[in-house]
């Protein structure tokens, strides 16, 4: 009976004026895991709701922290709309080790095109395209966490 249903169902739908595309793609990961491309490039400071800025910490040039805004080169980032990466020179914001757990650290790492380096803006949030989780500045370091609407997950782009 299944082959008959397969043939009859499209005919029945067409008779009722309902036309379906040849292929339907369903995202089974749910609405919290969408990763649209950014609408345009953004650059400059990335400010937290607390008025601090994302900053490269210390001499290792990998650790990211929140710090008083001063507009120097170590606080200037660029969101590349084409690749979905947030860059600081030739390095990208990277969820360390490709982790997806809450609290996984976000560092600067050589850009490599992997999903753990792709991000998108969602209102004032910056979300990982890999996990759908939000960039979070709750601790002194940056991490990803399940999006919860807190001010630690709200960021503003621009300025120097």
Spell out what each predicted region is.
Residues 2-9:
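Sec-dependent signal peptide recognition
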Residues 14-15:
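C-terminal motif of bacterial Sec signal peptides marking the signal peptidase cleavage site
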Residues 18-60, 76-100, 118-141, 157-160:
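Extracellular glycan-recognition/adhesion modules and their associated mucin-like linkers
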Residues 61-63, 74, 103-105, 152:
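A detector of repeated loop/turn-to-beta-strand junctions in beta-rich toroidal repeat architectures
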Residues 63-68, 104-110, 142-146:
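Aromatic-rich beta-strand patches that line glycan-recognition/binding surfaces
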Residues 71-73, 112-115, 149-151:
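Short coil/turn segments at the loop-to-beta-strand junctions that recur within blades
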Residues 75, 108, 117, 153-154:
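Glutamine-centric residue-chemistry signal
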Residues 146-160:
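Short, low-complexity, Pro/Ser/Thr/Gly-rich segments in the mature regions of secreted, periplasmic
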